Every structure is written in structure tokens, then in C-alpha cells.
Curated annotation (Swiss-Prot):
<feature type="cross-link" description="Glycyl lysine isopeptide (Lys-Gly) (interchain with G-Cter in ubiquitin)">
    <location>
        <position position="299"/>
    </location>
</feature>
<feature type="binding site">
    <location>
        <position position="206"/>
    </location>
    <ligand>
        <name>heme b 1</name>
    </ligand>
</feature>
<feature type="binding site">
    <location>
        <position position="481"/>
    </location>
    <ligand>
        <name>NADPH</name>
    </ligand>
</feature>
<keyword id="KW-0812">Transmembrane</keyword>
<feature type="binding site" description="axial binding residue">
    <location>
        <position position="115"/>
    </location>
    <ligand>
        <name>heme b 2</name>
    </ligand>
</feature>
<dbReference type="InterPro" id="IPR050369">
    <property type="entry name" value="RBOH/FRE"/>
</dbReference>
<keyword id="KW-0407">Ion channel</keyword>
<keyword id="KW-0813">Transport</keyword>
<feature type="binding site">
    <location>
        <position position="354"/>
    </location>
    <ligand>
        <name>FAD</name>
    </ligand>
</feature>
<feature type="binding site">
    <location>
        <position position="280"/>
    </location>
    <ligand>
        <name>heme b 1</name>
    </ligand>
</feature>
<feature type="binding site">
    <location>
        <position position="513"/>
    </location>
    <ligand>
        <name>NADPH</name>
    </ligand>
</feature>
<feature type="binding site">
    <location>
        <position position="287"/>
    </location>
    <ligand>
        <name>heme b 1</name>
    </ligand>
</feature>
<feature type="topological domain" description="Extracellular">
    <location>
        <begin position="223"/>
        <end position="267"/>
    </location>
</feature>
<dbReference type="GO" id="GO:0070402">
    <property type="term" value="F:NADPH binding"/>
</dbReference>
<dbReference type="GO" id="GO:0006954">
    <property type="term" value="P:inflammatory response"/>
</dbReference>
<dbReference type="InterPro" id="IPR013130">
    <property type="entry name" value="Fe3_Rdtase_TM_dom"/>
</dbReference>
<dbReference type="Pfam" id="PF08022">
    <property type="entry name" value="FAD_binding_8"/>
</dbReference>
Length: 570
């Protein structure tokens, strides 16, 4: 239990508080509409569907208030910077912003479904009551408002049978129109957010996600028409529904039961979302301001297997290890921004990214930079680009530990280029505050040739460490997870050579996936009574594996070895 608390305690606490707030709001507002006399006649008309529609609406307000906050990248970077004095456990919660964003989105989808279904029943019953296709009591309540000086309870005022009556409500009432629009927006946003769409059709994901603007506008005005109505406070003093509801034929004829008066609930949603919407507007203004700042591409390097490196400079640009930026190239697309991990170190006088050419946008950038041509390209011919960032990630905490495990899978190796470079600069310059003493680096890939630029970096570090007589500082393992029989024979023939046949490094490439249980046990035994940071940039399946290993191999007491799991999310 103690092992689990070390890694997941605060995260679970945050989730439980969030779930608790959802349960509290649902129960509270269910009782608000299910018990008080104010909605006595509304319940007689709509039944339990009234409370079942309003309770999830309150939860929707709460979650729509939260949904924008995890994607305010500049706000999160500010909080991460201002919380530098806090423990890494606190800062790690900011690195799970996208996970929380997705959880809130699914909660919105759940409450939207409940809210919509309940209101479909409400509309059906209201329409039926207006066309005398209901019980006499509901018909009588629905007729209130037809005479002068009466206020209505049933928001359906036209006498049109279903299903035409329901469609009429959907296309004429503000709540119906906005409800249809925001539900369609939500469906499109969620269905285009699957992993397959994001990876293969990023443009679809990008553009449909911007339907959130329509979603929030529709949400803010959804209740402006006040169709959910209850008895007014003044009317309740004159007309007590529990005493008068059985004498509906005598309403207005006897003193104690005058015709009840009704009014709609004032819209509340805008009060929940105006704050986050203002923060997000500020976020977008900051992004726009940054995008207008001049960025100079100082060098474009073409690496094997369609990978390019962009080295850039921007006035006032300051970065930390493992951070990422968003890049826009107007020549390729005037609206699209794409995230890339910085591969340069803070100590260098430029910042760089490595881009694998795998889609339409990257292919367009590849051609715009002249990388498809053999001849040298002049700098003035390079395209203009805009940069937003940098933004913080879990990797910033790498210097908070004495021992770290860095695990990169495929292109997920890029954040660690920045870390390894920076560590080496600090080591060579004998940085007095360098706490980090040992790095265990794991690189899992199906084809190392696709990332030869990183193998070149490792070769450089290997050579420099030998010159400094400190080969024990960095222990690295390159694991090739994909090969065929001919490659296996070739590897076997050259196994006894001094340098690895694939990477040219002295450390030989391993074939297959690491035995993580053995790796964690070995590292834990070599560093007792140590907090070991585990940093991953890779797929969710590997994240689950490493997270479980961190929990199972951490000691339960306050002393002993503790593996602290961190994952890149951007």
C-alpha cells in the first residue's frame, strides 16, 4: 500500500475530490428539483425526468468549468515554475493535465447523455399534454397561460402532435437549437479525438477540436429562454400546492387557491464558465503574441530516413530540458500548430527540434525547407515559421534526483537528447548544484536507422566520457524490437567486433524488450535508500508496465528505495 501511495497517492486524491464533487452536485440538485414545493407542479407535469435532467446539468456546468484549464499551456507552465519550491509529487500532477482533460471530457459526455435523454422525455410529455394526449391533471397544468394575465408552466405553447411537435420544439426554442448544436459539436470533438485519428489525420483532430468555441457559446446561452419553470415565491405564499393540487377545478374561484404563477430559472451556466473562458482567452492572446515574434532558422540539417533538424533563434527565448514547443509554418498551413520536443540543451545558443517526415504537414515543411533538393539552400529561401512556447514537461524534474531511469520508445527518445546534452554541459562545466549522479538510459526502437542522429549523439557522449574517465556516469541500453532472419544472421556474424554493428557504439545493441522486473531490481539493489526518478516518453502500454514496476519495486516505508514514475504528455 505504501508503494502505491508514493506514486499515485496525490493523483488518486485529486480524482476522488473531483468525483466527490460530481456526486455531491448531482445529489444536491436532484433534491433541489425533487423535494421543494417550488417545483411541485413541474414534477406533476414532468415526473422524475425533471430532476434527472437538472442534476446532470449542474455537473455539466462544473466539468465545463474545468475542461479548459488543463489545456491552458502557459498557465500550467507558470504554475510549474512558481511551484518549483514544492515537492516533485505536487509538480507531477501538472504533467497529467491531458489525462485529466480526457477524464473531464468523458464525464461531460456521460452527463450530456443523461441530460439529453431526460429532456427528450420532458419534451414528449409537454407536447402530449398540449394536445390533450395525457392525464387530465397535466392537461390542466399545461393550459395555464392561455388566458390573459396568466403565466405558463408548460414551455410548449403550440398544439402540435408528436413527432412533429418535438421537432418544432427543437428548431424553434433556443434551448432546443443550442442543445442540438452543442451535442453535435461534442460528438464530433470526441469521435475525432481517438488515437487513430490523432496520429493519422491530425488535421481532422485539430480543426474539429476548435468546435469548442461554438460549444461554449451555445452552452452559455442554452438556458437564456428559461424553459424550466417553477412556482414563484410570491405565489407560494398565496397558493400552497400540497393543499390545492387536488382542487384544480376550484383554482381562481376560492381565496386559498388562486391561479398559481410561474417563472423560469435564471441562466446559471455562464457564471460557471466565464472565469475559465477569460483565462483561455488570455492564453490565446499570449499564444498570438508569441506567434508574431520573429523566429530565424539558422540551420536545417537533413538526417537519414527523412528526418530533419531545425536549428532556430528567437529573441528572449529561454528553455529548460525536455520542454516542447508548438510550430506553425504559414507556407504549409496558416492555422495548424504542431508540437515538437526540443532536442537542444539550455546551454546552447540556439534551440532545435527533430522532425520525422510522416504526414502531409511534415512533408510540406520538408519541401518548404528545400530538403527535397540536392543543392545547398540559401538562408533567405527558408520559410517563415512561428513558435509558441516553450512549455514544461515532467522531464524538467530530472535534476531533482540523484539517480534517474530514462526510457524512450521510438520517436519518444527526442526529449532525452536535450537532457543528455544538458547533463554533459553541466558535468563539463562542473556545475556546483548538479545533484544527478547516475543515468540509466533505455532506448526501445524497431529501427535504429530512423534515428541515426541520436546514435551520433550517444557516440559523442561515449567518446567524451572516456576522455573524462567517467564512463560509469551514463549506462545505456539500446533495444532493437524489430528484425528479420537475414538481419539476425548479420548481427550474429559481427557480434564479437569491438563496436556495435548497428550503432557504432561500444555498448552492444540488445535484441528484444528489456526484462523490466530484473532491471528495476538490479538498479534498486545498487542504490538503496534512494529516490529514483523514472522518466518515460512512449506508448501507454509501456507506461502501464513501468508504473506497475515502480509501485512493486518501491519500499513501503519512508526509507528505502522509491521509484517515482513520470511520463511525457503533450
Amino acid at each position: 500500500m505504501g508503494n502505491w501511495v508514493v506514486n499515485e497517492g496525490i493523483s488518486i486524491f485529486v480524482i476522488l475530490v473531483w468525483l466527490g464533487m460530481n456526486v455531491f452536485l448531482f445529489v444536491w440538485y436532484y433534491r433541489v428539483y425533487d423535494i421543494p414545493d417550488k417545483f411541485f407542479y413541474t414534477r406533476k407535469l414532468l415526473g422524475s425526468a425533471l430532476a434527472l435532467a437538472r442534476a446532470p446539468a449542474a455537473c455539466l456546468n462544473f466539468n465545463c468549468m474545468l475542461i479548459l484549464l488543463p489545456v491552458c499551456r502557459n498557465l500550467l507552465s507558470f504554475l510549474r515554475g512558481s511551484s518549483a519550491c514544492c515537492s516533485t509529487r505536487i509538480r507531477r500532477q501538472l504533467d497529467r493535465n491531458l489525462t485529466f482533460h480526457k477524464m473531464v471530457a468523458w464525464m461531460i459526455a456521460l452527463h450530456t447523455a443523461i441530460h439529453t435523454i431526460a429532456h427528450l422525455f420532458n419534451v414528449e410529455w409537454c407536447v402530449n399534454a398540449r394536445v390533450n394526449n395525457s392525464d387530465p391533471y397535466s392537461i390542466a397544468l399545461s393550459d395555464i397561460g392561455d388566458k390573459p394575465n396568466e403565466t405558463y408552466l408548460n414551455f410548449v405553447r403550440q398544439r402540435i402532435k408528436n413527432p412533429e411537435g418535438g421537432l418544432y420544439v427543437a428548431v424553434t426554442l433556443l434551448a432546443g437549437i443550442t442543445g442540438v448544436v452543442i451535442t453535435l459539436c461534442l460528438i464530433l470533438i470526441i469521435t475525432s479525438s481517438t488515437k487513430t485519428i490523432r496520429r493519422s489525420y491530425f488535421e481532422v483532430f485539430w480543426y474539429t477540436h476548435h468546435l469548442f468555441v461554438i460549444f461554449f457559446i451555445g452552452l452559455a446561452i442554452h438556458g437564456a429562454q428559461r424553459i424550466v419553470r417553477g412556482q414563484t415565491a410570491e405565489s407560494l405564499l398565496k397558493h400552497q400546492p400540497r393543499n390545492c393540487y387536488q382542487n384544480i377545478s376550484q383554482w381562481g374561484k376560492i381565496k386559498d387557491c388562486p391561479i398559481p404563477e410561474f417563472s423560469g430559472n435564471p441562466p446559471m451556466t455562464w457564471k460557471w464558465i466565464v472565469g475559465p473562458m477569460f483565462l483561455y482567452l488570455c492564453e490565446r492572446l499570449v499564444r498570438f503574441w508569441r506567434s508574431q515574434q520573429k523566429v530565424v532558422i539558422t540551420k536545417v540539417v537533413t538526417h537519414p530516413f527523412k528526418t530533419i533538424e531545425l536549428q532556430m533563434k528567437k529573441k528572449g527565448f529561454k528553455m529548460e530540458v525536455g520542454q516542447y514547443i508548438f510550430v506553425k509554418c504559414p507556407v504549409v498551413s496558416k492555422l495548424e500548430w504542431h508540437p515538437f520536443t526540443l532536442t537542444s540543451a539550455p546551454e546552447e545558443d540556439f534551440f532545435s527540434i527533430h522532425i520525422r517526415i510522416v504526414g502531409d504537414w511534415t512533408e510540406g515543411l520538408f519541401k518548404a525547407c528545400g530538403c527535397d533538393k540536392q543543392e545547398f539552400q540559401d538562408a533567405w529561401k527558408l520559410p517563415k515559421i512561428a513558435v509558441d512556447g516553450p512549455f514544461g514537461t515532467a522531464s524538467e524534474d530530472v535534476f531533482s534526483y540523484e539517480v534517474v531511469m530514462l526510457v524512450g520508445a521510438g520517436i519518444g527518445v527526442t526529449p532525452f537528447a536535450s537532457i543528455l546534452k544538458s547533463v554533459w554541459y553541466k558535468y563539463c562545466n562542473k556545475a556546483p548544484n548538479l545533484r544527478l549522479k547516475k543515468i540509466y538510459f533505455y532506448w526501445l526502437c524497431r529501427d535504429t536507422h530512423a534515428f541515426e542522429w541520436f546514435a551520433d549523439l550517444l557516440q559523442l557522449l561515449e567518446t567524451q566520457m572516456q576522455e573524462k574517465n567517467n564512463t560509469d556516469f551514463l549506462s545505456y541500453n539500446i533495444c532493437l524490437t524489430g528484425w528479420d532472419e537475414s538481419q539476425a544472421s548479420h548481427f550474429a556474424m559481427h557480434h564479437d567486433e569491438e563496436k556495435d554493428v548497428i550503432t557504432g557504439l561500444k555498448q552492444k545493441t540488445l535484441y528484444g524488450r528489456p526484462n523490466w522486473d530484473n532491471e528495476f531490481k538490479t538498479i534498486g539493489s545498487q542504490h538503496p535508500n534512494t529516490r529514483i526518478g523514472v522518466f518515460l516518453c512512449g506508448p501507454e502500454a509501456l507506461a502501464d508496465t513501468l508504473n506497475k514496476q515502480c509501485i512493486s519495486n518501491s519500499d513501503s516505508g519512508p526509507r528505502g528505495v522509491h521509484f517515482i514514475f513520470n511520463k511525457e504528455n503533450f
